[in-house]
Amino acid sequence: MIETSQTIPELVSWAKDREFSLNLPTERLVFLLAIAIYNNERLDGEMLEADLVDIFRHTMNAFEQSTDAIATRANNAINELVKQRLLNRFSSEFTEGLAIYRLTPLGVGVSDYYIRQREFSALRLSVQLSIVADEIQRASDSAEEGVENNESEHYWRRNVFAPLKYSVAEIFDSIDLSQRIMDENQQSIKDEIAELLTKDWQAAISSCERLLDETSGNLRELQDTLNAAGDKLQAQLLRIQDCVIGRDDLYFIDQLITDLQSKLDRIISWGQQAIDLWIGYDRHVHKFIRTAIDMDKNRVFSQRLRNSIHNYFEHPWFLWTAQAERLVDLRDEEMVLREDDALGELPEELQYESLSDLHDQIVEHMQDLLIAYRENNRPIDLSLVLKEQLENYPLSRHFDVARIIVDQAVRLGMANDDLSGIYPDWQVINKRGAEVQAHVIDKY
């Protein structure tokens, strides 16, 4: 795909010839992580064998292992890390038999995964996307300048290809790696929830709710950050791609742009898919809890309640109860189709009104309202228009009314602030706390 890429047979042959292998039991992995942490605290990044022996002694204490022949065992562990290319050993006649050790790129990569890649926050993602946006912006400006001045291939490699490949692509890879770590984190939370459900039910349900809500919130926050920047990044990549269309000598840039577009699409797509999968898991856990309680009405739970009542004066407790409002319970698993024939006439206020009729009425009204703005060249403050119009409709229709108003408004014009990258403030549009985030439409 890119110039430096290798085929699968080439990579297989390369790894086979060098006899690459990794074998890191828990003790060896902990030893490597301890070396990495110690190495980060040193300015020169160099370690003596005595340093490594001391580190090994500390790790063995954590495993409560014997310290007999510690020097020999430490030397064996060091030799294993050197053999697996996790450590580099340097020695010469000037060191008088004292070797110097440095972590290899592989050692740094393995330890970095366990130490520094565990945190994936919206703030970190925002910073990464901000850096990417700046780099792509500079590259697109350079690309347009290169077209105007008919610059040489050297100019394109230095000002367009290099920042995209060595900055933007690496940050995309970092975000992709962080998403994979989030996948692993979700799996660990699932294991924790499964363990909780085998313990005390009152504490388990509360803890499960907290874990489910925290994970859902984190996934949604991160995906919102990605969605906000994704379209703008794709637009900048398309600017660069337009500049190299028809230029056979710049094929390497076109290939790189295609690669970056695919990576960005994959990141955003998987983020949304992860949210959908987690929502499904969330529903599954809640359904499991409800089913377990329903099936256990006359067994374990009732017996626990009897024992608690019997021992109330020795161990007082609070009784928490919950009753679902059945008439407004719209969960999919509790909806039942009814085929009973309805007889008689409904009161006028309960007469059925089709959604298409409602849609046509609202569209006609909103068109008349919004066209007046365009004819007078008045800006449309969507939040204000929504707030005023929703007051005329019952709460059950607010979603459809809001969707129709927004759909009609964006057909009339656009907001200049959309192009500036400024995020609009959230504005409350009804008494139930619904909010909308929209720029003022000021260009028709």
Curated annotation (Swiss-Prot):
CDD domains: MukF_C
GO biological process: cell division; chromosome condensation; chromosome segregation; DNA replication
Pfam families in the record: KicB, MukF_C, MukF_M
Region (Leucine-zipper): 212-240
Superkingdom in the source lineage: Bacteria
Main location as per UniProt: cytoplasm
Single GO term (MF): calcium ion binding
Name of protein: Chromosome partition protein MukF
